[in-house]
Amino acid sequence: MTDVSSPAGGAASPVEMSTTSSSSAATTSASSSKPLTNGANKTAISTAAGGVTPGAVPGPGSGAIPASSSSGNQVKLEHHHRQSNNNRPAVTNRSSETKLMTPTGSSSSPSQSPSQTQASIQTQTSQQDRLAKASTTASQQDVDEVARLFEEKPEAFEKWLTERAPPEALSRLQEFIENRKPHKRPSVTSDLFQQWMAASPTVQQKSPRSLSNSSASSLPECRRHLMDLDEGELFMELIRDVANELDIDVLCHKILVNVGLLTHADRGSLFLAKGTPTNKYLVAKLFDVTQKTALKDAVTRASAEEIIIPFGIGIAGMVAQTKQMINIKEAYKDARFNCEIDLKTGYKTNAILCMPICNYEGDIIGVAQIINKTNGCMEFDEHDVEIFRRYLTFCGIGIQNAQLFEMSVQEYRRNQILLNLARSIFEEQNNLECLVTKIMTEARELLKCERCSVFLVDLDCCEASHLEKIIEKPNQPATRAIKSADSFEEKKMRNRFTVLFELGGEYQAANVSRPSVSELSSSTLAQIAQFVATTGQTVNICDVIEWVRDHNQIRAEDEIDSTQAILCMPIMNAQKKVIGVAQLINKANGVPFTDSDASIFEAFAIFCGLGIHNTQMYENACKLMAKQKVALECLSYHATASQDQTEKLTQDVIAEAESYNLYSFTFTDFELVDDDTCRAVLRMFMQCNLVSQFQIPYDVLCRWVLSVRKNYRPVKYHNWRHALNVAQTMFAMLKTGKMERFMTDLEILGLLVACLCHDLDHRGTNNAFQTKTESPLAILYTTSTMEHHHFDQCVMILNSEGNNIFQALSPEDYRSVMKTVESAILSTDLAMYFKKRNAFLELVENGEFDWQGEEKKDLLCGMMMTACDVSAIAKPWEVQHKVAKLVADEFFDQGDLEKLQLNTQPVAMMDRERKDELPKMQVGFIDVICLPLYRVLCDTFPWITPLYEGTLENRRNWQDLAEKVEMGLTWIDHDTIDKPVEEFAACADEEIKDIEFTVTTLNCNQQSQHGSEDSHTPEHQRSGSRLSMKKTGALGKAVRSKLSKTLYNSMDGSKPKTSLKLLESHVSEDMDDKSPTSPSQPQASGSMGRMSASSSTSSAGGQMVDKSKKRSKLCALL
């Protein structure tokens, strides 16, 4: 069945469009219509001019034929049209319709004379024949020629369209193209959403298929046309009419109009179910809609006067509650009927048919109600009931789809609003009032409420109440006591409101106030907000007076008389702490707030909390930045050297570089006092000609040096003297090592400054410790933590008043030297060294000799900084082992902190209990870091060979000491590791008294796999004057051979046997209880001997020592 107004047959041809536009009688017909059949033909003919009366059908002759004429006329008319369609081209079909009309487009008036009517018809017929002939001729003769031209020269056609085509032709061409496009089914797409957002659904242009969109005058014709269909075709046509409609307003209007057509009902109403599962009600979507009621009028009337019917009340309410149909034959005799509407409108209701609308799950989603029959019947019969039920079954599916689509549209709008709120949070970070006002405005408009309020909690009061109290109990340690449960009043005191934002009601614009305690306590709305802030629960109040009565803490006041519904929700921050309360008062339509409203309002509360928290964090950050500036000013003042110190250093005489031994790689600071260290630094700047080269004021340089020294902490190793040694090594590499030929003066200045500042404010702990303890420095700098801090301290000192030694530099030179300083300081991180080492080695292996490129220079400076930072390893042995002691003690202090604070076992180099392994670890440090670095630098720059040679010498010393530890000769059992064991040899020429040695004979045949345990005296049980030997029981052959050789070679050559005999005579066999025994071996094989040497024997042994070998082995004393 073809719809009356649908373009089902496709688009009309351009010739047809030309013909119809030339005739004023066809102005109301669509250009895309095609010939209709059966009943549709009659309707098309009767409505073509728009002026034919409903009771007449135009005939092929001169006048209108009465509707009461025999059906034979209709058959002849249809036959005439069929014959005309067969004999003429399709284009003349419109002309045949036009011939029946006057030139004005109306039917021939019966008052016209036959001659006038005949003349008019003949004139019109001749005009139409000429137009049709011209169109036919053009279509047959010219189309082929034009087509060939278009095919041969499409560029010319395109140029003609763009330059010379008339606007009317372009418009008709566009219309033709649009009409040729297939009709698309409406779908939930972004285009549909955009169309939905562009205009209100009730005023948008509706689909031409919609029967409910027809004008009031055309409805009788449409109805008559549909009534000529059989019942099945009519039913399917009306189902198709509502099947794809997604606008709930349009859908409800179509349903009521179509139901009126099906059941001959005079008018109808449609109610939709709303509310919560415990409080459901019906809302009149459209009310008293007739077949002539326009959609816009129906929607406007329903919006202006919203009718709400609770479930179980009235006829519609009973149908919704029971899900049963109600058919009332005489309304005024039914007690459930409310005649107030009839009294208002003057309409009398006789028969009522009310039926539920259910979804696929069987739940009530609406109620449809029709009133009074129009075909003369006084009641709705069973046939009407059945048609009504069948049609509403399909309508239930359509309503649910439309509601889902409406929900998706609402969600889309909600997301857009929330997106705007998210933008507002970033735009209004510094203005809390503007942010809250914007959020309240959006919430009030979206949820359609009368008033909106936001209460902010006094955070200072809340924080102060959570302070832990330290309570001393008798005979018990101090404990933290926090109440597990506070009373309601105590929680109220913590959540005290300080700021109130109000919008709506008497405040059309946002009002911000700071209510007093008395004002808050006398306001019911404030008390409700206080309750929500205290409990942290959302409150949705439908009856305020009853709710207030149930909560004794809330006192009812006069302000609640006008309050019908309240939705109150807590606002929380990221820590789930209540920072405010949002409150909505009264829906605009007088209904309670729904769960959907609460869900939407929750999103607003979350964004409000995020915005408030973000704004407060921003304010706190601004305050902290101000505090930081004050702290930096104080730090700068106290970190800067005093004027007296500066004047004194300025007036001091600076000795020559040779007197400080600055050119030597064996420089040591042990004999320099603190003032001399500063003078040595000044001398290095002078020798490099930096003071005059960069116009550094001498007093500024002195103050800067003193300030740098002042900002080093008194840790054991990474202190000011370490910085001095690093700077001196850099100076020696530049001068003695001739590295200055590869550097510019500006780079030399940057390197010396970097060396002096590379460990500023060092805390005696490394980067790993900062990360493990999550210190502020580790949070501030994620990589190279301490190195970044050292550079920042360097910048802070330079920015302090009177300390900027770069003040005379140009901006470009300043940026360059600061870049050099930063890169050099960061290069002292060994992690950076390992990253750069491979690239540097590759350049060296390729024979690189040009180091002037930026990347190459950066690599070279980085390697030089690392070489200077670890240069203590190349100092003379007397200096090296003392520095090693300082480094070890600092590491051990960090290990103690890790045990105490982190409860973790430190690594070996930081474990005080494993200090005997220090020589071995030093050898590993030299092999992994120092020797490879110095070797490659020495191969490339041979003038710095002393660093490599000093490192090799110290490695031999540490390796020798590591072997002694392996033999059981450990560090002297002092709390510190001041002296290595070989320094006892220096005392060989002195009389050794009262020193008791414990010598243990070792079972060299016994293997460690026997499960022997270390039986040497624990470290904490050793006396200060006792030397122990480890009883490993499994010394290697090489170690035993070396021990024996050292023993014999240390004796007097003339008395070797006597000395050995003397040694053996004092060895008594003794069984050690801790020595392991094996069942397969006699216990005597693991026997141990103990010897006590008296002072006289020790003296005699000491006299046999060659005095020229003061650093001989310990065994020489035996």
UniProtKB/Swiss-Prot annotation:
Task: Provide the GO biological process annotations.
Answer: cAMP-mediated signaling; cGMP metabolic process; negative regulation of nucleobase-containing compound transport
Propeptide part(s) removed at maturation, as residue ranges: 1116-1118
Q: What EC numbers are recorded for this enzyme? A: 3.1.4.35
S-farnesyl cysteine-type lipidated residues: 1115
State where a divalent metal cation 2 binds: 759
Identify the PROSITE patterns for this entry.
PDEASE_I_1 (PS00126), PDEASE_I_2 (PS51845)
Which SUPFAM superfamilies does the entry link to? Answer: GAF domain-like, HD-domain/PDEase-like
Record key words, sorted: Cell membrane, cGMP, Hydrolase, Lipoprotein, Membrane, Metal-binding, Methylation, Prenylation, Repeat
**How many cofactor units bind, and how?**
Binds 2 divalent metal cations per subunit. Site 1 may preferentially bind zinc ions, while site 2 has a preference for magnesium and/or manganese ions.
What is this entry's stated membrane topology?
Lipid-anchor
Q: Which ranges are annotated Basic and acidic residues under compositional bias?
A: 1011-1022, 1065-1075
Tell me, what is one Gene Ontology molecular-function annotation carried by this entry?
3',5'-cyclic-AMP phosphodiesterase activity
Cysteine methyl ester carried by residues: 1115
Q: In which tissues is it expressed?
A: Expressed in Malpighian tubule principal cells. Also expressed in adult head.
The answer, when asked if Lipoprotein is one of the entry's keywords, is yes
Give me the stretches of Basic residues compositional bias: 1108-1118
Give details on activation and inhibition: Inhibited by sildenafil and zaprinast.
Q: Which cofactor does it need?
A: a divalent metal cation
> Pfam families annotated for this entry?
GAF, PDEase_I
Q: Where do the catalytic residues lie?
A: 718
Role? Hydrolyzes the second messenger cGMP, which is a key regulator of many important physiological processes. Has cAMP phosphodiesterase activity in vitro but not in vivo. Has a role regulating cGMP transport in Malpighian tubule principal cells.
Q: How does it assemble?
A: Interacts with PrBP.
Stated family: Belongs to the cyclic nucleotide phosphodiesterase family.
Q: What protein name applies here?
A: cGMP-specific 3',5'-cyclic phosphodiesterase
Organism lineage string = Eukaryota, Metazoa, Ecdysozoa, Arthropoda, Hexapoda
